[in-house]
């Protein structure tokens, strides 16, 4: 492992409710409103890894912001959600601008498309030891739902079904969703061990910056969530 950097950008996860799941967006356990129209996909995987597109209910509360929600009684083993976070510019004054590509922005350091995604394990199946076919994924190398507080979960990061290059990949080494994480830059995409928090919701948080050219990049923020007893 190399240096660390603060988790500044928000992450995404599926939060169980009495009727299904809310797609939550925030940090340290607090939830912020977002534009639900940016939620592109929510999929359900059964025990045989067969997928179903789940109908997304989008609620707008104020200033185009709200949340996305699913109602489901299906016995899914895994849920996956994806949000298109649109185009961003980072400028020399350390400000971020969420405006369309080609906008008249001065003093650009980096610019590019941003995506957020999350996988939630409802019921453990062996196929979850491998990528499920999404763009970026955190893959557990054992059943994480059987772990206890203080145990370590070994994971690997994937992009396009292949091991992600360690360069520009970061991950939080603790699965507690209610604390301010440090994201650790990886030296290698092997032996990544995440410390399990107290029983309940666990959130493994990772980010990856894929270079396009000298200034253009694609940012990926992706999580793996599950519950422990």
Regions found by a protein language model. Name each.
Residues 9-20, 91, 96-153, 158-166, ...:
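Beta-strand-rich domain onsets/edges
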Residues 71-73, 196:
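Residue-level recognition of secondary-structure-to-loop junctions
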Residues 43-51, 168-186:
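Short amphipathic beta-strand segments in non-cytosolic proteins
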Residues 83-92, 210-216:
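Short acidic/polar inter-strand loop motif in beta-rich domains
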Residues 75-79, 200-204:
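Exposed beta-strand face motif in extracellular beta-rich ectodomains
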Residues 62-66, 180-200:
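Glycine-centered loop-to-beta-strand initiation motif
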Residues 8-69:
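Start-of-domain marker
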